[in-house]
Amino acid sequence: VYVLRAFEDADVPGPTDPLEHLRIVELELTLADLETVEAQIERKRKQSKLDKSLAEEVKALDAVHEALADGTPVYRSGVKAADRETIKPYFLLTNKPVLAVVNVDEDQLERVDEVVAPVEKELGELAPVFGACVQLEAEAALLDPEERTEMLDAFGLGEGALPRFVRAAYNALGLRTFFTTGEKESRAWTFRAGAKAPECAGVIHTDFQRGFIRAEVIHWDEL
């Protein structure tokens, strides 16, 4: 999650342009990833001479190293999806899904779309972006539910940033939710987007997946 500053505060040093902040964050993460790859790549090249199964991993590291050395985060690069998958065990910071939160102040809430727009344009389809006044959200979180709702409504914040953040993070990670319900409880379950009914059943219990017969589709209001 990139938390990008847009709020004005003379007591807090640093840029207040979220686009500039984005570039600083990306540069720092890219340099950290470059250091990680350079610490591994020569060792893997030597090992691949004795173990041919490492050839694909070395190829992937070379592709990623080229992008990082050029100052390009992996998620912005043209590195193939297969190569990005191969290097996952290295836990590179710029090879992860990205969610950008532009931290605005109270005075910017009425024009938050305008403040967020340059970051949305820069990231395009690469990452979801939304604005939030983190200071207000933190203050609201300390209140009881009724007072919190009143405060958020007073500032026109609706449900607040947290539910939007959770939904955006779920989508960025390729996660979805299904529900089970019965007389004793209703429960939410997390599954990977694109999973089929048997795989979702397996999330509840592996026996359900092994013994899966069929799924019936009915309208929600018939439940």
Label the model's feature ranges.
Residues 2-30:
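Conserved P-loop NTPase nucleotide-binding/switch module
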Residues 8, 13, 31, 35-38, ...:
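Hydrophobic alpha-helical hairpins/lids featuring a short glycine-rich hinge
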Residues 17, 25-29, 33, 49, ...:
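Short, well-structured alpha-helical patches and their helix-loop capping segments
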Residues 39, 43-223:
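C-terminal-of-GTPase-core extension/linker across diverse P-loop GTPases
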